[in-house]
């Protein structure tokens, strides 16, 4: 039939358009088929109020998170982290003093061992994840992690907002590449309240960035919060509250998340590395002291 021949001639064009729209995230029916595999990661350098608030909110939703707490916080609030570990939270070690780029192996090993012992003394569970400042790592980090039996090190994002896992063939330790997003002229950084705040973002702008990421249909992502920011301040917490209710994301425990991510096994030399940090000195649009706290934290110092 003439009309059928005409339709057949146009079918490749329609198909090409559909594929193009799918790639940029404009086909809702395709987007709705597979929810994003999402992981919440909490970081704490200060006190405990933000972590406790996150714990309450996640508990109401039947969720847990990956938590990185600096050694001083672990030591000051050991009962909290013992409880969190018992509830199923994965407690990661962190050395925030320096990025582990081009740091001697012996120093990395000693620092990592100290962190591991501190975490395990409190949680009574093996420390499976480690990260340094800016999620920096190099081959010495992998060597040290292998020597200490640490399963994962955290790395700066190398695939945009897509979070992924690399398995260097030379090592047993895997690299978790976190979600990474650009902002203005301040380069790229983690999909994280502090990272965006330090680059001059407001809570409203963070909401816009995150909304676009969640709508893009990524297979896997990591949403990070410095709990003393996102867990305490109203404008920033509301962004996370909305994200937790997003029907296009399945928020997973750490074990569920890593088991669902496709592992990229390749030689270390072929694994991409990101060393860009343009916000070493924060340049916030609104300083912390001028942000409005959540009602239950007003009048408290942190």
What are these regions (language model features)?
Residues 1-10:
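N-terminal secretory signal peptides that target proteins for export/translocation
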Residues 14-25:
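Bacterial N-terminal signal peptides
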Residues 32-53, 289-299:
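Boundary/entry segment of secreted carbohydrate-active catalytic domains
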Residues 58-65, 73-76, 83, 152-158, ...:
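C-terminal domain-boundary segment and adjacent tail
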Residues 61-141, 160-164, 171-194, 219-226, ...:
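Metal-dependent polysaccharide deacetylase catalytic core of the NodB/CE4 family, i.e.
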Residues 82-87, 142-151, 168, 241-245:
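Short, surface-exposed basic-aromatic patches at helix termini and helix-loop junctions that form
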Residues 90-92, 149-156:
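Short hydrophobic/aromatic-enriched beta-strand-loop microsegments
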Residues 183-214:
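Aromatic-anchored helix/helix-loop segment that forms the rim or "lid"
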């Amino acid at each position: 039939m003439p009309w059928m021949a005409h339709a057949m001639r146009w079918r490749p064009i329609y198909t090409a358009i559909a594929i193009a729209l799918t790639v940029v995230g404009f086909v809702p029916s395709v987007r709705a088929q597979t929810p994003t595999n999402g992981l919440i990661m909490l970081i704490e350098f200060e006190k405990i109020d933000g972590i406790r608030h996150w714990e309450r909110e996640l508990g109401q939703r039947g969720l847990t998170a990956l938590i990185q707490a600096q050694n001083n916080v672990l030591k000051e609030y050991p009962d909290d982290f013992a409880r969190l570990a018992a509830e199923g939270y994965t407690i990661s070690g962190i050395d925030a003093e320096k990025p582990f780029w081009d740091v001697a192996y012996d120093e990395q090993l000693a620092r990592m061992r100290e962190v591991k012992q501190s975490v395990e003394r409190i949680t009574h569970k093996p420390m499976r994840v480690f990260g340094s400042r800016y999620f920096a790592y190099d081959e010495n980090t992998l060597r040290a992690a292998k020597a200490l039996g640490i399963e994962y090190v955290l790395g700066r994002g190398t695939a945009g907002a897509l979070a992924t896992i690399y398995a260097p063939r030379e090592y047993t330790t895997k690299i978790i590449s976190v979600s990474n997003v650009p902002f203005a002229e301040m380069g790229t950084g983690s999909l994280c309240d502090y990272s965006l705040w330090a680059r001059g973002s407001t809570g409203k702008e963070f909401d816009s960035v995150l909304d676009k990421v969640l709508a893009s249909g990524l297979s896997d992502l990591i949403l990070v919060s410095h709990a003393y920011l996102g867990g305490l301040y109203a404008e920033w917490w509301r962004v996370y509250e909305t994200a937790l209710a997003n029907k296009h994301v399945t928020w997973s425990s750490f074990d569920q998340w890593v088991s669902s991510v496709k592992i990229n096994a390749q030689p270390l030399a072929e694994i991409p590395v990101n060393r860009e940090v343009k916000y070493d000195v924060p340049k916030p649009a609104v300083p912390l002291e001028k942000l409005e706290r959540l009602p239950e934290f007003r009048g408290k110092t942190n």
